[in-house]
């Protein structure tokens, strides 16, 4: 089985991008040092030569510092070896170092590494082989406890730019990774949260206002509030700072008294013929009657005009025109009242003239009368929706001599 960039995994040929052929030989001794299973560590401790331990340490350091991972800040050795575990003939290192499950996820970043060439172990006489194997056992349980290179001080940022990752060592980020309050490096999302410099303090040169919906300028360029600016634009002068006092109510003039009735409250002050102040009631009375209003008509309260039209007044006016509107006749029907304006026969009932059936007189009580002047002989009975056909006819005998006759009859709708 072959993968791009990895070569053939089914053979015993070492990976060219991860293992240096000069450090790991293809002799059977490599199988002795890299057996599969946890017991391989103890076996390697008893049968490993110092030179083999030195070569294994250099190989492990080279695994960590391979140039193939210089383009990513993530050390991908562990996931790759975990994938190679189930492949026949794959790397035996994945089997004994990590077991069935990987301890390093693919997104884990080593923050304490630096980009440096692999360092060889200085112990060449084999005295440190036991401590090195103990270190391998410790790494098997927790790989992040093994540090082959010197750790960086905490005050310096991690140089991730060597691996091709994002560079956070700029002035926008502090060494600990917290963002700084710098408006030059703020993103559009952070601009609303960062403290902004206060706006320029503006003040109206006319009234001294500091808050207005719209700032305006006068001819000289000074700031004006919206009210002062509009006033200056419309009137050509500055808006007065003191509002003019409202017009005093005439009825509450101090010291003013009616010359006629000596009242001090009125809706309107007037003057009489001599120029003295009088109240509204006395002034109107004198204007209409040319005499002073009598003191007996004086009231404590001010009488107002009732401007609402009442229906009772209209009924009284309608019933007073031309005598009575309709009268009950001898047979129970209502009659037409005829009378002369100058002969004094107003109120006489013309006998024999009935315009409606008995009991219908109440239908015409609210109707206004129609006044007709002249002789009655030309009036002819007419049918209507409420009146019906006349039951009698006009008298054929001679009519009493009248100069003018007034006939009052209800309207027919």
Curated annotation (Swiss-Prot):
The modification N6-acetyllysine is found at residues 233, 245-246, 252, 308, 312, 314-315. Highly phosphorylated on serine residues. Phosphorylation on Ser-310 is enhanced on erythroid differentiation. Phosphorylation on Ser-142 promotes sumoylation on Lys-137. Residues 200-330 are annotated as: Interaction with MED1 and CCAR1. A zinc finger (GATA-type) spans 204-228, 258-282. SMART domains: ZnF_GATA (SM00401). It is linked to X-linked dyserythropoietic anemia and thrombocytopenia: Disorder characterized by erythrocytes with abnormal size and shape, and paucity of platelets in peripheral blood. The bone marrow contains abundant and abnormally small megakaryocytes. This is Erythroid transcription factor. The gene is GATA1.
């Amino acid at each position: 089985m072959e993968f791009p960039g990895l070569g053939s995994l089914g053979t015993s040929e070492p990976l060219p991008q991860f293992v240096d052929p000069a450090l790991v030989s293809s002799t059977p001794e490599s199988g002795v040092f890299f057996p599969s299973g946890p017991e391989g560590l103890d076996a390697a401790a008893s049968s490993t030569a110092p030179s083999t331990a030195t070569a294994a340490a250099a190989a492990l350091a080279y695994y960590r510092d391979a140039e193939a991972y210089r383009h990513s800040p993530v050390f991908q050795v562990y996931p790759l070896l975990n994938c190679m575990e189930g492949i026949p003939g794959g790397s035996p290192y994945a089997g004994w170092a990590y077991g069935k499950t990987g301890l390093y996820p693919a997104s884990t970043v080593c923050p304490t590494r630096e980009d440096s060439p692999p360092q060889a172990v200085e112990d060449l006489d084999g005295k440190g082989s036991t401590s090195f194997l103990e270190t391998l056992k410790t790494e098997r349980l927790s790989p992040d406890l093994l540090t082959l290179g010197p750790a960086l001080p905490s005050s310096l940022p991690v140089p991730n730019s060597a691996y091709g990752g994002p560079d956070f060592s700029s002035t926008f980020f502090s060494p600990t990774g917290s963002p700084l309050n710098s408006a030059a490096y703020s993103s559009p999302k952070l601009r609303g949260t960062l403290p902004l410099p206060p706006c320029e303090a503006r003040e109206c040169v006319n009234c001294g206002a500091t808050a207005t919906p719209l700032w305006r300028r006068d001819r000289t360029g000074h700031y004006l509030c919206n009210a002062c600016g509009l006033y200056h634009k419309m009137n050509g002068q500055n808006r007065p700072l003191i509002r003019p006092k409202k017009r005093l109510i005439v009825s509450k003039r101090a010291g003013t008294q009616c010359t006629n009735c000596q009242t001090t409250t009125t809706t309107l002050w007037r003057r009489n013929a001599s120029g003295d102040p009088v109240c509204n009631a006395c002034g109107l009375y004198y204007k209409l009657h040319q005499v002073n209003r009598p003191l007996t008509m004086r009231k404590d309260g001010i009488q107002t005009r009732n401007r609402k039209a009442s229906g009772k007044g209209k009924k009284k006016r309608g019933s007073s025109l031309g005598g009575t509107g309709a009268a009950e006749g001898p047979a129970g029907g209502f009659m037409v009242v005829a009378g002369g304006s100058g002969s004094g026969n107003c109120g006489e009932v013309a006998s024999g003239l009935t315009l409606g059936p008995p009991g219908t007189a109440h239908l015409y009580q609210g109707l206004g009368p129609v006044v007709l002047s002249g002789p009655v002989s030309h009036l002819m009975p007419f049918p209507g929706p409420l009146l019906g056909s006349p039951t009698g006819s006009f008298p054929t005998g001679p009519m009493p001599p009248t100069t003018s006759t007034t006939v009052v009859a209800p309207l027919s709708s």
